[in-house]
Amino acid sequence: MGIKKYFFYLILFFVCKSSFAQQNHDTIYINNQFYIKHIVKYGENIDNISKFYDVSVKKILETNETSTKLFVGQSLYIPFENESVKSNYIKSNKKYKIALLLPFYKNLNDTLVASFEDKEEAEDIILGKSKMALEFMQGVEFALDSIEKLGIEIHLNVIDTRNDSAKMIEVIKSRVLDTMDLIIGPIYSRNMDLVSKKYGNDKSKTLISPLSKSSEFLKNQISTVQINTPFKNQSRIISDFIEEKYNSKDIIICYDENEKGLALFMERKLNKSSNNIIKMNMIYTHIDSIRDQFLDTQIVILPSNNRAFVSRMLGTLGGIDSVFTVFGLSNIKNYDHLDIENLMHLDVHFPDPYYFNQHIKKDSIFLYGFEEKFFLTPSRFSFVAYNIMMHFCVDEMRYDFDKFRMNSGKVNINASLVRYENYFLERAKN
């Protein structure tokens, strides 16, 4: 996607004093224009929203590319011209000390650069392992632009973990983390476990695991948070959707023997009284071996984190002359070798805790602002970092958390169920 000119991004807050809208509204500034984000509530219509903000119906409809038929929960972006309103936003006196623990591998990069005779060429060389950390850091930096304009004071301490347990122990012993309010990272689970054991029950802190699938660090650690939605929570999202949309359908749960426990858990979550459920241990995944075991129309669930197994099953199902709706886990999104046309053909659904859609106003504003600042398209790591900063520093509700278990940390349960439509990920409709 090309660089979008003339856009820049600024998050502000505006508090409406009328009983018509008693919650904070995001106020967004794009290309010298203020927009107030309004969430449509029960009983509201385009006319009374227009009167409240003193903005014409035509202007609201043009800005949001919508019709006069609104629905509860819909986000509208209201263009605002009133000078008194522009200056009436809240400046915060909040302060945060934040530790960002990322694997930059600076030591390895220094060694790599030193090996080049041409120092100008060496400056452009970055060890591939560092790419994720650098992209994550860009998301944090972009969020800081907005956060600091709100008057929120951020003291950021960036620490290179090198993805090395010995280095992480050294950081913990240094006590540099003792005074932090937020600890973001480490990225990898074994290092997250070390930090959690030291600070996981410190009520003055929040420890955030941004990417890891492992939930071990949450156990008996009440100040910990996991952004990547765990399997059991993904199972609930899938089962709730199936029971609402595909009640009384034939369901087959295909699993690898090593992941039988995942299949059993998924089976328990589904309503056996209204669905015919079959579990199948897929010892063989070749099309000729399993073709006869599937019906003409069927719901297929692949509760697996095994890349090879999921890939083989999707390839095999794509070659069977039946109509399937397939449900899998969020890891499907990371398998970049999969054929999107086959995913569309199989109507593959999966929960996505990191869902991004450039056609959604909130996400498009992030995209345009990021491109304006860095002259490149943001990666998913930049988007995750930005959302974490905005959620925990600005109280923008990017996530929804629930207890992992009693006396433990919290997990993100806001994972949209998505499917590919016209080669783009879209939210699945009930």
Question: Where in this protein do the model-derived segments appear?
Answer:
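Structural motif
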Residues: 154-174, 235, 283-294
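A solvent-exposed, charged loop/short amphipathic helix patch at secondary-structure junctions
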Residues: 107-131
